[in-house]
Amino acid sequence: MAAPESLSPGATAEEAPEEDEDDAEAEDPERGTGSGGRSGSLGGSGGGTAGPGMALGGALTRRAVTLRVLLKDELLEPGEGVLSIYYLGRKFTGDLQLDGRIVWQETGQVFNSPSAWATHCKKLVNPAKKSGCGWASVKYKGQKLDKYKAAWLRRHQLHMPVATADESPTSEGEEEELLLEEEEEDVLAGVSSEDKGHRPPGKGSLEPEATPPGKRMDKVPVPIRYCMLGSRDSARNPHTLVEVTSFAAINKFQPFNVAVSSNVLFLLDFHCHLTRSEVVGYLGGRWDINNQMLTVLRAFPCRSRLGDTDTAATVEEEIYQVLFLRGLSLVGWYHSHPHSPAVPSLQDIDAQMEYQLRLQGSSNGFQPCLALLCSPYYSGNPGPESKICPFWVMPPPEQRPSDYGIPMDVEMAYVQDSFLTNDVLQEMVMLAEFYKGAPDLVKFQEAWSPEHTYLDKLKMSLASRTPKDQGMCHVLEQVCSVLKQGS
């Protein structure tokens, strides 16, 4: 699909569609007009600026309320990054200048009005977009601009009913779109429709409510659907989470079968529980090309920090040696989202696509690469058990090569091992020692819930992945004891 044609900010009526805000700039009472100006629009005569009585007498409409007017009356203050637009998963940030113009931070383009900027940005994401309410789409320090316009009108046009002043200047057909955009913003902010319905009534203030002292307000990212992504965009947040798609939903069959050992999930889950930071590891197994069966037999935790490239190289070399000695192949990788949903981010999707191509190599035969994503502490998990998401990335359609890869949900067969192997127990001991005393180590003696500690939570999650033979449970208790002491 061809890139949308570049728009000249504020140059055409299309960029300020519903309010003709560029015309409103000319009507701006704070800018003044010459003898040939449009003073008649303010109810005056001749070339002078309309007096206060005329301006407040009702002739001054919403169209004449510009950013410059709000700045002059100190409802807004100029600043860098104070303006923002959220649209279909994209965030745009702008600077508000002293003269009321908007500078888009990404390109430095200057726009004369909120509608000009909003329409330009939305067309970049959705070329079919024709118009939109700029004052309802653009936010100033987190609050929609139309609220500031309504506040100005209430201040200066006292005869106007409050309900009328609060109405957004939306044209016919735009209300539904604005509702959809608001729903999307709530999704990106992690606000459900149920939470939205239980919000307390507004206080009438234009300033965001302060966070209570000492209370941490973390916004949990909420995944978006793949169809909302569109073409690849470097300005998009790489940590945007994307829902996985089932093969059935696109009328395709999963191209390979997967069987995973319970010991793999046991060790993986244990590793991901240890720290509040993201962890990474590799998966070893075998690929049976005749039966199209991928069997995952071993997990290899990386006992290194994500930023420690020197240690990571040494650890990876050790893992490759063990794989070779055991006659196993590298068949995938795993990592954690400690407090976020177990779905991949855009960064994860690109990484998985790269790993798939690496494992494929120059051979013509197909060899899959599996990704496992574990979320141990996400508040949306239904219980104490970690959520583990297996996924694989399908390349984008040939006609849309610039799109992101499609994260596909992979069905796995679970194979319960007979016992915990010494390799697994040894890895658990080494992991406990590696994270011992680390600042991001989970404090296992603290409360995870009113009834259970974090150590209880770990044990309950591992219980679903234990082998048939429970004879090694005393060793597991020893490992858990080490964790409790170390945290």
From Swiss-Prot:
Keyword line: Acetylation, Hydrolase, Metal-binding, Metalloprotease, Phosphoprotein, Protease, Zinc
Stated EC number for the protein is 3.4.-.-
Annotated stretches, region: Disordered? 1-55, 163-217
Residues engaged in binding DNA: 113, 115, 135
Q: Describe its partners and assembly state.
A: Monomer. Mainly monomoric, but when binds to dsDNA, forms homotetramer assembled into two homodimers. May interact with histones; this interaction is facilitated by.
Family membership noted in the UniProt record = Belongs to the peptidase M67 family.
Name the UniProt record assigns to this protein: MPN domain-containing protein
Source organism (scientific name): Mus musculus (Mouse)
